Amino acid sequence: MSCRPSSVSIAVTGSSGVRVALRLLEALKGEVEIRGIILTRGAEEVARYEEGIEPEDLRRLLRSYAPLYMENDMSSPLASSSNQPDAMAIVPASMKTVGLIARGIPSSLPARAALAVLRLGRRLVVAPRETPLGVVELENMLAIARMGGIVVPLTLSFYIKPSSVEDLVDFAAGKVLDALGVKVDVYRRWRGPEEGD
């Protein structure tokens, strides 16, 4: 799929970097239809610790973007291959979710929806934020790439000359947007060393 998607779904799982998911949703709003958001309990815990957002407040915020489904809601429309969007992003992607997708185990809604997207030949973007990476984690990400998924690690970038954490968040969200095929300028793109500041 090389064209811009008209619809996307987003899964927010229990890894550091929930702020990137929130920035991604902010950038997507008004650009494409957000078919649904999947939230895990682990993501709620991370949001509480990293951002000081209580679970009920996080759910309310996410519902302002799209219908919200919890990780065990297998009755969600996103659980069915008959109702998949053009693209899906898992941001941040926990190693648990990465492992389930890589092994084809649809035991959570994020994994089930991702596997349905892949089966249909649609775009799946998986954004892990984990370090260091061992053999198991690398093999799981390789398996997803071989299945047609796009792996976008949430890494730091210094060529953008960040002046704040928000600059780094924008960069990470922008890379996910690029992989989804949704061009929204949220970060400074490389134009060569001559460009200057």
Swiss-Prot record:
Q: Which domain of life is it from?
A: Archaea
Q: Which organism is it from?
A: Aeropyrum pernix (strain ATCC 700893 / DSM 11879 / JCM 9820 / NBRC 100138 / K1)
List all disulphide bridges recorded for this chain: none
Give the keywords, sorted: Flavoprotein, FMN, Prenyltransferase, Transferase
Task: Write out the residues that bind FMN.
Answer: G14, S15, S16, T40, S94, M95, K96, T97, R129
Q: Does the keyword Chloroplast apply?
A: no
Q: Which reaction does it catalyse?
A: dimethylallyl phosphate + FMNH2 = prenylated FMNH2 + phosphate
Positions that bind dimethylallyl phosphate: Y159, K175
Q: Which family does it belong to?
A: Belongs to the UbiX/PAD1 family.
Keyword Transferase annotated? yes
Q: Name one GO molecular function term.
A: flavin prenyltransferase activity
EC primary class: transferase
Give the protein's function: Flavin prenyltransferase that catalyzes the synthesis of the prenylated FMN cofactor (prenyl-FMN) for 4-hydroxy-3-polyprenylbenzoic acid decarboxylase UbiD. The prenyltransferase is metal-independent and links a dimethylallyl moiety from dimethylallyl monophosphate (DMAP) to the flavin N5 and C6 atoms of FMN.
Q: Which gene encodes it?
A: ubiX
Q: What is its EC number?
A: 2.5.1.129
Q: What is this protein called?
A: Flavin prenyltransferase UbiX
